[in-house]
Amino acid sequence: MSRRGTAEEKTAKSDPIYRNRLVNMLVNRILKHGKKSLAYQIIYRTVKKIQQKTETNPLSVLRQAIRGVTPDIAVKARRVGGSTHQVPIEIGSTQGKALAIRWLLGASRKRPGRNMAFKLSSELVDAAKGSGDAIRKKEETHRMAEANRAFAHFR
């Protein structure tokens, strides 16, 4: 039996302006080379652009987009015998949000456009409406899990 204790789960901090944990999670994922102030600038510009586009509360659009992209189930490669199977596993809420944010940022980076704030705001608005690359990625993951449902007992 291991002598090591289990690590305490860290709670996500809130960002200074909106006091929102999701915004802070986004900032930490968009961060590159330790330039956190630039990451904050990009996110705050994104929020302003969402406000201009939708004329509703931008944080509710962000919440709705992340809720729409968050997967319930995913597949994990598991080696059984000589072959590797894609085994469907359930995903917790924290891990699901992290995946959703990663997918949203990946989809927005692939988009054509002027700058990251513009691309991310477009992707978030699309995801809130139920379209976009991030939503497609979620649906594809769910399809994969459904197709490999027969291997669920390998968990």
Curated annotation (Swiss-Prot):
Record keyword Ribonucleoprotein present: yes
Full protein name: Small ribosomal subunit protein uS7cz/uS7cy
UniProt keyword terms in alphabetical order: Chloroplast, Plastid, Ribonucleoprotein, Ribosomal protein, RNA-binding, rRNA-binding
Primary location recorded for the protein, binned into one broad class: plastid
One Pfam family per UniProt: Ribosomal_S7
Residues spanning the signal sequence: none
Lineage: Eukaryota, Viridiplantae, Streptophyta, Embryophyta, Tracheophyta
Quaternary state and interactors: Part of the 30S ribosomal subunit.
BP-aspect Gene Ontology terms: translation
Disulfide bonds: none
Role of this protein: One of the primary rRNA binding proteins, it binds directly to 16S rRNA where it nucleates assembly of the head domain of the 30S subunit.
Stretches of the chain forming a coiled coil according to its record: none
Localisation: Plastid, Chloroplast
A GO CC term assigned to this protein in UniProt: small ribosomal subunit
UniProt record similarity statement: Belongs to the universal ribosomal protein uS7 family.
Example GO molecular function: structural constituent of ribosome
